[in-house]
Amino acid sequence: MIEKVFGKIIDNPKITLNGILGLTIVLTLFIPKLTIDFSIEHLFSQNDPAVEEYFSFRNDFGREDNVITIIYEPIDHYDINLFKELENIFYDLEELNGVERVISIFTLGDLDTRAWLGDLHGENSDWNRDTVIQKLEYIQSDPAIGSRILSKDLRFGAFILTLSDFANNHQDRSAVLKEIKRLTHETSPSWTYSGVSVLRTEYVGYMVRDNFLFLPPIALILISLLSYVFRNWVFVVLPMLTVLTTVIWLLGIMGLFGLEINIMTYIVPTLLFIIGISDAIHIQARFRENLNKDSYSPREAMLVTINQMSRVIFLTSATTSIGFIALMTTSISIVQEFGMEIALGVMIAWLVSITLVPSGIMLFKSFGRGRENTFSPILLWLSDTIPKRPWVFIIIPLFISFTAIYKIKDLSTDASLMDDLRPENKLFNDLKLTEQYFGGVLPFEVLLELENDQRTVDKTVIDHDILIHLDKLERLLNKELSNSRFFSIMTLLESVKRIRGDESSVSYDKNFIDQVLNLRGDQQIQLINKEKNALRITGLIENKTSSEMDKIYAKIDSLSRSFPPYLSVKCTGTTVVALRTNNYLVQSLVNSLGVALVFISIIMAFMFRNKSILLASLITNLIPIFTVLGLLSWLGVSIRPPTAMTFSVALGIAVDDSLHFLLRYRKELTQCTNRVEAIKATIMSTGSALMITTTILVSGFSVLLLSAFLPTYQFGMLSAGMIGTALLCDLTLLPALCLVLPHKES
C-alpha cells in the first residue's frame, strides 16, 4: 500500500508539488492572524499556590507591573528652560491615552509650597539657582516619592508613569512608549526608558530582531554546505524549500488555532530551519548512494530510497519530537506550546520531505552522481582504526565523562530575572542605571493581613498597634534591600507629617488616617484593600537571585513570628512568582529529560530487541548530556530553564544519528561476513550523511549566539556542544561498543 502511494508520488511529481503549493498558499492566509506578545504571566506555573496568591493580590490592589520609569540627565541641572521643558512634558504625559497617573518633581508642589518650583512661565519669575537647589533637595528627601523621582546627588530625575489596565498589551504599550519617546526626543536632557512595561515591549522587539538576524546567516550556511556536498542546484533548492514550507505550514496552523508568538515560541521558525532540513539531506544522500551502487534506473532508485528512508526518518523524527513533547509535562503554558509546536513542526518536515524531495528530483531529472564521500578521509581513518583499538575509543570518552560528571553534584539552580539579558545589552544597562539611582524596576509586594475572628472584632489594620508592626516590616525591607524603594501607609504618613510640620513622633488617629486615604483618590496606589483587612508595602527592587530572595523571605518569616497570631505576612508580586517559577521549572524540565529518555529507550528496545545494542545506544547518547552538565558545574554556570530545556531537546535530536547508524549497521550485518566489516561499511556509508547533518545542526545552533537574549544564547551554545559531542560518540564510541559488546551478528 505504502509502496503504491510512493509510486504515485514519484510518477506524478507535478501533481504532488502543486498539491503542496496549494496547501501552502491556504495556510499562508492564516499567518497574519498571529500576534506577538510577552507577559510575565506567560512564565507562571498553572498549579502554583503562589500564582493564586498573586492574582488574589491583583484583584484587591490592581496591577503592580505596569510602571514605566523615564529617567532624564540634564546638561544644565538648574537652568529655568530645563524646568519649563520638564513641566510641559509632565502635562503632556498626563494627557497620554493609556497613562493612568504620572509622578514627577512637580507632583509634590501641589501639596507643599516648599516643594513648589514657582511660576516658570511668568514674566516676573525670579529664578534663583540656590533656591532651586534647596527645593530640589527638599523634594528628594520626601519619604513617599522623593527618592523615586530624584537621585540623591540631583544628577538624575525621573517621571514615574503607571499604565491603565486596558493598555497592558503589546500594541498599546508600544504606542504609549512610542509617544513618550516622541515627546522627549527633541528636549535638552538625555533620556533612559526603564521599567517592566518597557522590558516587555523591548523583549518583543528583540524577538523580531532575532528572527531577522538569525535567518540570513542560517540560510547562507545551509546553502553553502548543500552546495559543497551535492554540487547540484536542485539538491540545494529542495531542502531549502522543505524547511521553508514546513515553517509556513506550522505558522499557518498556529494562526488558524489562535496561538501567539511569545518569548519562547519566537524561535520556532529558526529551529525548524535548523532541525527540519536533515530529513531531506538523508533522502538525497541515500538516493545518490542507491543510484551509484546498484544497477537501478532513477525511478527504481528513488522508489527504493523512499521506501527505505520514509520509515527511518519517521523514527528519527519521532525521537526528535519526543524530546520536545517531553516539555509538555511542565505546567508552564509557553513551554508546553513551545514543545508542542516544534514537535508538530518536526513531523511536518518529515511529511514534506518524503513528498517534496522525491517529486522535485524526478521532475527536474537530477540524476547526476555529484560529489561522493565528502568526509571520506576522516571516515576511512575511523573505519580502519576503531576495529584495531576499540577499547581506546571506549576508555577515553568514558574517562572524560566521569571527570566531568564528578562535578554534577555541585550544580546550582540560582538565577535572577535579569539573567535573560546579556550584560552588554542596552536594555540591561538601562535597568542597571535605574537600579543605581532609583532603586530598581522589579515589583515586590508585601502584605500584612489581619485575620477576621473573635480576637479582631474591634480591630482594623490602621490601628496604631498594627501600624507599629507594619513599620517594623518596612524597616526590615529597607535594611535588606537598601537600594530599593518602598511605599506604604507609614511612608505616606511620614510625608504628611513633613507637609504639616508635625513632629515625627506624632501618632495620628484612625479617623485622620481614613481622611488621608480617602483624599488620595482611586487612581493613586492602593495601600489598603476594600475590606480593610490587609496593608500593602509596595516596592521596586534591585535585581536579586532566587537564593538571595530566599534569605530575605526567611528574615521576613522570622520577624512575622514575633507578631500577634492574628497577623500574617505574605510576599507576592511578579518578581516573587517568577523566581519561584524558575526553580520549579528547572526541576520540571529535568523530569522532562527523564520522560524523554524513557520513551526513546522504549522505541530503541522495540526496534532492536537486543540488550547490548540498547545499552550501547543509551551510553552513547547520555555521555554528551552528562559531560556538558559536568562542564557547566566546572565553569560555575547555573542551571536555568533554557539550559535545563536544552537537554531533553538535544537528546531527541542526538538520538537521530544513533538510530541512523544502528539501523544501517543492522542492515550491513546481514550482508557482511562479520561485525568488523559491517562496522566499516556502516561508517563509510552512513558517516558522511551524519557529518553533513550534524555540521548543519551545529552551525545553525551556533547562529543563536548572536541573540540579545542570554537564554537563547545558552540554548544555542549548549545544543551545538551536545549535538557535536553526540556525533563524535556516534562515530567513535558507538561502533567500538558494537564491536566489544556481545550480540548476534545476524
What name fits each language-model region?
Residues 11, 205-261, 329-333, 591-637, ...:
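Interfacial segments of transmembrane alpha-helices in multi-pass membrane proteins
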Residues 55, 61, 84, 126-233, ...:
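Extracytoplasmic
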Residues 250-367, 706-707:
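Hydrophobic alpha-helical segments
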Residues 390-393, 397-516:
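Juxtamembrane segments of multi-pass membrane proteins
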Residues 240, 279, 293-330, 618, ...:
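Pore- and gate-forming transmembrane helices of large, multi-pass membrane proteins
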Residues 225, 314-357, 361-362, 601-604, ...:
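Hydrophobic, glycine/alanine-rich multi-pass transmembrane helices and their short helix-loop junctions
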Residues 235-283, 613-662, 702, 729-733, ...:
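Hydrophobic transmembrane alpha-helices and their membrane-interface caps
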Residues 1-38, 354, 359, 363, ...:
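Signature of alpha-helical transmembrane segments and their immediate interfacial
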